[in-house]
């Protein structure tokens, strides 16, 4: 085992394959995790069973790590995490392409194409999500940059602002037609009425699931840690996020 761990290149992905209860975690991953901690490297763990957290929390604290936990299964023992913080940071730095790339990745997590038959709904919902987020980055206050605001934007968007326009069309009509916010959202607000209503419904569904729970909405509205700390300080971050992420 020691020889195997020494051969692992930490700059590359490692896939450990084996049957259930074959000892993958105890025999390979836990020893590798020990080595990472002993080398004072930062760790991010998607820990659905909380086995890493339960086994390594005390060791991480003793080694001087800051431990942050995003746990949507146990809301009373979770730090806050706003998934829009990072793209918003890059947007404010003038790196709009980077912000849009991150938002697009997040959108495809929210709206996966499970059947991989017709990617239309996944792609158009992601585009609307990206467009709304970029519009929020441009016009919103910092405390409004969260998934709750995106959901509100969608639910209000189909309401009539006038006899001929809804609020979604009215709002984006004020935007530069060459802007990324306008282009991404235009696939929806320029669509026929029935198609537009279907897109809004599909886009709203996973967001409503998140923000419909007051405590979850609160946790996802404000980060209680600086994401820069993941590279600048010794940190262990554990995620237990069912369903969407």
Task: Put a short name on every predicted segment.
Residues 4-245:
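P-loop NTPase motor domains
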